[in-house]
Amino acid sequence: MQPPSLPERYLDRRHWLGLATASATVGLINQPWIFAGQQAADSKQLIVHGETPMNAEPALNKLVQSWETPVKHFYVRSHAPVPKVDLDSFRITVEGMVQRKLSLSIAEITDRFPATEITATMTCAGNRRSEHSRVKKVGGVQWKAGPIGNARWGGVRLADILQLAGLKEGAKHVWFESIDQVKKDGRTFPFGASISVKKSLEKTRFGNGTLLATTMNGRPLPPDHGYPIRTVVPGYVGARSVKWLGRIVVSDRPSANHYVANAYKLVTNGDQDEWAAAQPIYKFPINS
C-alpha cells in the first residue's frame, strides 16, 4: 500500500467539467437523495453512533485496507441532518472585510477558477474520545479510533476566491458557515468554523492549502460529506472543514459561532470560565 508520489495534482478542465456534466445528466446534481440507497448500503459498513444526525466510523481493519479511504469506509461526522440543496438557486456568498462582495454558483466556481486536487487526511477532533471517557467521562459522540480518513479532494483554492474578492486592510480571519441547521440548547443555528487569513492563503510543498471541494475520490461529494461544496483545511482537525458551505466571511477576529467560541477546545475542569479562556483546537495532534 504505497502513497502516491505527488500529494497533489491539477485536473484537466475537461475532466473537471465532465464530472459535473455527468452528474447533471443522471440527475445527481439537483437530487442528492439519489445517493441515499448507496449511502444506506455504505452505512452498514460503518459503526453507527447516531443516525439523526449521522455519526459513524469504520472498523479499523477496514480503514487500513487502502491508502485512499473509500467513501464507504470514511467516517461521517454531522451536527445536523443533511440539508436539501437546489443547485439552480444555490449560491455561496463571500462578504465582510472584502473589496467586492461575491455571490457564486457552483458552475461559476468551477468555470472561473483553476481546478485542483489534493490528497489530505481528515480526522474528527473527538477521535478516541471513548478512551478518554474510561478515565474521565467526556460528553459528545464516544468515538473509537476510526474517525479518520485519507481522500482525494477536488475543487478550487480558497485563496483564488479571496483574491477575486480582495481583502481589506486588517483582515485576519476567514469564517465558514454551513447551510445546515443545528438544534442545540433551544436554539437553531448553522455549523461554523474559522481559520486565519494566513492559513487560507498558504501554499506549501505539501499542497495548495485550503480548498473549496466539490469532489471526493474523483466523484461528486456525497451528501453526508458535504454536497455540493465544502471546505477542506489540510493539517487541521475536521471541525475546521465545513460541510455544506454556504457563506464565507472575512473578519478581523475569529468567528463567534458556537463551534469556535464554545466547543472543540481542550479543557481540564470544564467550567464556563475555562471554556471561555481556552483556545480552539486547530492543528491535528499526532497520537498513536
PLM regions: where:
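N-terminal secretory signal peptides
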Residues: M1-L11, H15, A22, V26
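Short, intrinsically disordered, low-complexity terminal segments
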Residues: L19-T21, G37-Q38
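Structured, non-membrane catalytic/scaffold regions adjacent to prosthetic-group chemistry
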Residues: G37-S288
